Amino acid sequence: MLNRRFLRTKVFQALYALEQGAGGGAAKNEKELLLGVERTYDLYVHVLQLFGEMRRLAENRIEDRKAKRMPSKEDLAPSRRFVDNPFLVKLSESRQLLEESDRRKVGWMGEKDLLTQLYKRIEASNEYVAYMASPQTDTAADRAILVDLFTEHIAQYEGLHEHVEARSIHWLEDLDLACTMVKRTVETMGPEPGDIGLADLNTDMAEEREFVTTLYRNTVAGKEKDEQLIAERAKNWEAERIALSDMLLMRMAVTEARTFDQIPVKVTLNEYIEIAKAYSTPKSKNFINGILDKLFAEMKADGSIHKVGRGLLES
């Protein structure tokens, strides 16, 4: 479920810390790398729980209106469209989500003020008002309102960002990805009774752990050989003069191209150029592109790179 660029970035950060002597040796840095991936899933589950919390507050709001001393006709028979939204019901009653939340020890206990303010923000939104006032609804509208409320109001809520930062310094940098994962969950789940599709979470995590550990370990193991390969093709540059971030990204790219036979070479090249834009110097993307393009062509010619299946695409 985590996108590969995020995983590559996590590996890059772990390798950078290793080169800087931070966090201990290779094994300890690998452990922290895997914990980082796990923490992202913790955050995903935590944010996904907000739908259930919003439904609970909406139910409470309905009961409070009925309990007024002098309730109006609307108070006594309020619209239940939001609380009965099939997608919201499914999210709030998911056993998988409850079990995963318990296992990961994440929840919203003690956050009454934050949740109340968030619900008020949702209830006052144009999207919510229009949805509740619409003469009728359908499956597309029921899904769309949750996606819109999440994208425009929950994910953008400053109180959520402050809460996440207070809980973990690691969480804040992963919040955008976690929100993307939550949005994708809502967009892909069906309206029919049943669970929300977290069944593949463990499978996804196992595949992601294998990808990051293999990429990390093989990049560490091939350091001397790959640094020499890169330095030989960097005219007028000795290995020690190449920026550490550039060298690490190129070592990772060479390792990935050599190791993962179903990832196209073009995908690998483009991914590391994109990461360089965020983590290296302004000129790095052109430098890295030039070196890797030359190196990959040679590696294909001598058989160092061998692709199968999907890896043959555009390689």
Ranges and model annotations:
Residues 1-315:
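Class I Rossmann-like S-adenosyl-L-methionine
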